[in-house]
């Protein structure tokens, strides 16, 4: 999130998602093939949205809001995918046999728990500390100018929202195909 707010959000988002895929899935031997595309796309969308929201990286309030919104977007998309898998009978819900409606409560609680604990401890606090301190200091080391409010990558618009929705649709389709066992 920090790099998405300081540099080009799309490049940082793709790098963050690739790093998470390599270091938390492939190196640990937990790579799930097509199923990993859902996580890759939702992480990319979450970091990209957070990076686009920040126009002035010195504004602590906006940095904090963007960090929570980006994290919430990623977690919410994952929650929707999990609910859709149960509701469309692609995957069984083991918690309460015969009661697929209970997935709403279970996934909703998991979303709130992840957002309140992981979102604050591992996203909000480090981002609030790092972004204002690194802004204007790290960019010259890389031969770049610091982002300003006039930067073309600052702000959300309809085009960004449409691309994010299309990316999420691809994530849902990939996870549904992976969960149903459809070979490619």
Language-model regions, residue ranges each:
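Hydrophobic alpha-helical transmembrane segments
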Residues: 13-15, 36-37, 41, 64-68, ...
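Membrane-helix interfacial "entry" motifs
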Residues: 5-8, 31-35, 55-63, 104, ...
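Membrane-interfacial helical/loop segments at transmembrane boundaries in membrane proteins
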Residues: 84-108
């Amino acid at each position: 999130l920090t790099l998405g707010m300081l540099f080009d959000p799309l490049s940082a988002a793709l790098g963050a998602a690739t790093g998470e895929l390599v270091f938390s899935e492939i190196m640990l031997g937990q790579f799930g093939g097509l199923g990993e595309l859902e996580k890759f796309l939702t992480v990319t969308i979450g970091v990209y949205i957070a990076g686009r929201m920040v126009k002035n990286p010195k504004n602590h309030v906006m940095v904090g809001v963007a960090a929570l919104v980006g994290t919430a977007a990623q977690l919410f998309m994952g929650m929707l995918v999990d609910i859709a898998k149960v509701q469309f009978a692609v995957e069984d819900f083991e918690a309460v046999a015969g009661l697929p409606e209970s997935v709403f409560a279970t996934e909703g609680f998991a979303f709130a728990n992840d957002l309140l604990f992981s979102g604050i401890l591992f996203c909000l606090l480090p981002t609030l500390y790092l972004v204002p301190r690194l802004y204007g200091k790290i960019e010259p080391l890389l031969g770049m100018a610091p982002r300003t409010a006039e930067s073309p990558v600052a702000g959300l618009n309809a085009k960004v929202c449409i691309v994010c929705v299309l990316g999420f649709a691809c994530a849902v389709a990939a996870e549904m195909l992976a969960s149903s066992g459809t070979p490619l």
